[in-house]
């Protein structure tokens, strides 16, 4: 951290990331801080006092050596304009983290969907085989608050974080997929793709790029990277067997010329999780693990909360919590993985609603729509599937459970895959998912 000695640094954004930056830099540098959200400023005041909170109109923001920007702050924000006008470098918490951990190995994962599961799965595989690779980043653990390691880290990086990173070099960079998302932040789809591709800007001759070539956008990036002879490329696919790369087809993992049976794990169902497994397997092989050890670790993985999380079964009914599925593309992955689904969906709808799920409505036994999206979703589903319009998630769950119990089908699944953000009725997707877990567990406790 000597590079920041006696410097004047501004911290903009006081959520989890901003707080972690402050705790890293406090008492070492001349700091000022701010956040547009009064709630975040109030939390900061309670923790650290009011002395450092400085509005943007204060001239001290124009006389800084650096500004550490939280990833949620749009690059069109006034603080960014000030930084550019006064030639103040903007950095991120990832830059600070890398500076103090630069001798370690970094595995970075990005993609529109599946980042958190893949990050956790890679960490699980490595750690269960005697290595020490904690998770950090967008997975919910700010990098600067990550568990100490002498070996390396598995970092989940969003496009927002990749926009900010300046000095970070990775051992392995993973690109899982790219689908339309965050288009309120980016000018267009090309701008969003370029943000994701930045994960490959920070590689050296010893680095590996692991890329899903089933995805059209990712495949184009793969083709471009083939022109750079210094980067080692590992493609993966779940639709075809690759001669050189990792494939999962027909419940088998194909590792170049070798073939292994895919381990059964209820927490990793569906084609989307095959992508996550393929990427994780590739990374573990790069780090040096044997295939047998990797497969054993995959079979013992416990899924992250709220991400196609298997809760349990009773009366031939299985309960799955995919509260993190905040758009139709994410929800579709869970729906593809199951049959005879009693589907709970609703909240604040995203553009396009559930139109993208219509080709798979045959997997849904009955739907239960709630929240702001209920009328919109009902309009999409009418004359195609049975549905009930509900006031809230708890009411939807109770009706769904009653219907599932009366169904004589051998296997039934109650799935929370909202396809919406949660803010109309919940603080966040975690709170929504916890309610579903609580309601599910009532029936076998």
Swiss-Prot record:
It is found in: Cytoplasm. It catalyses: UDP-N-acetyl-alpha-D-muramoyl-L-alanine + D-glutamate + ATP = UDP-N-acetyl-alpha-D-muramoyl-L-alanyl-D-glutamate + ADP + phosphate + H(+). GO terms for biological process: cell division; cell wall organization; peptidoglycan biosynthetic process; regulation of cell shape. It comes from Rickettsia prowazekii (strain Madrid E). Belongs to the MurCDEF family. Keywords: ATP-binding, Cell cycle, Cell division, Cell shape, Cell wall biogenesis/degradation, Cytoplasm, Ligase, Nucleotide-binding, Peptidoglycan synthesis. ATP binds at residues 111-117. It comes from the Bacteria. Cell wall formation. Catalyzes the addition of glutamate to the nucleotide precursor UDP-N-acetylmuramoyl-L-alanine (UMA). GO terms for cellular component: cytoplasm. Pfam families: Mur_ligase_M (PF08245), MurD-like_N (PF21799). Its main location: cytoplasm. Its EC number is 6.3.2.9. One of its GO terms (molecular function) is tetrahydrofolylpolyglutamate synthase activity. Pathway: Cell wall biogenesis; peptidoglycan biosynthesis. This is UDP-N-acetylmuramoylalanine--D-glutamate ligase.
């Amino acid at each position: 951290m000597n590079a920041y000695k006696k410097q004047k640094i501004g911290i903009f954004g006081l959520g989890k990331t901003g707080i972690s930056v402050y705790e890293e830099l406090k008492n070492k540098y001349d700091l000022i801080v701010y956040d547009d959200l009064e709630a975040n400023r109030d939390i900061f005041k309670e923790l650290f006092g009011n002395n450092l909170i400085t509005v943007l109109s204060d001239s001290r923001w124009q006389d800084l050596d650096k500004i550490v920007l939280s990833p949620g702050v749009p690059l069109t924000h006034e603080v960014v304009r000030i930084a550019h006008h006064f030639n103040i470098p903007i950095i991120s918490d990832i830059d600070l983290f890398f500076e103090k951990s630069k001798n370690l190995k970094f595995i970075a994962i990005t993609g529109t969907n599946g980042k958190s599961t893949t990050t956790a799965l890679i960490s699980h595989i490595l750690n269960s085989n005697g290595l020490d690779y904690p998770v950090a980043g967008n997975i919910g653990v700010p990098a600067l608050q990550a568990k100490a390691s002498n070996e390396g880290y598995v970092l989940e990086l969003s496009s927002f974080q990749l926009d900010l990173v300046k000095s970070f070099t990775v051992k392995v960079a993973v690109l899982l997929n790219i689908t339309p998302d965050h288009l309120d932040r980016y000018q267009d789809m090309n701008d969003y793709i370029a943000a994701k591709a930045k994960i490959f800007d920070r590689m050296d001759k010893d680095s590996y790029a692991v890329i899903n070539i089933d995805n059209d956008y990712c495949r184009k990036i793969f083709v471009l990277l083939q022109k750079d002879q210094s980067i080692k490329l590992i493609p993966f696919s779940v639709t075809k067997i690759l001669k050189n790369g990792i494939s999962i087809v027909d419940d088998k993992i194909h590792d170049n010329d070798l073939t292994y049976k895919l381990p059964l794990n209820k927490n990793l169902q569906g084609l989307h999780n095959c992508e996550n497994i393929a990427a994780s397997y590739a990374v573990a092989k790069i780090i040096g693990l044997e295939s047998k050890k990797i497969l054993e670790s995959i079979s013992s993985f416990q899924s992250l909360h709220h991400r196609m999380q298997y809760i349990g079964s009773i009366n031939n009914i299985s309960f799955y919590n995919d509260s993190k599925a905040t758009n139709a593309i994410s929800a579709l992955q869970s729906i593809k993985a199951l049959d005879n689904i009693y589907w709970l969906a609703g909240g604040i709808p995203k553009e396009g609603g559930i139109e993208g799920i219509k080709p798979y409505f045959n997997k849904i036994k009955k739907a239960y729509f709630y929240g702001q999206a209920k009328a919109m979703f009902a309009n999409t589903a009418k004359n195609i599937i049975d549905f009930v319009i509900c006031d809230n998630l708890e009411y939807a769950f109770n009706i769904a459970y009653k219907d599932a119990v009366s169904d004589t089908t051998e296997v039934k699944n109650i799935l929370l895959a909202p396809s919406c953000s949660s803010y109309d009725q919940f603080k966040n997707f975690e709170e929504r998912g916890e309610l579903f877990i609580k309601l599910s567990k009532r029936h076998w406790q």
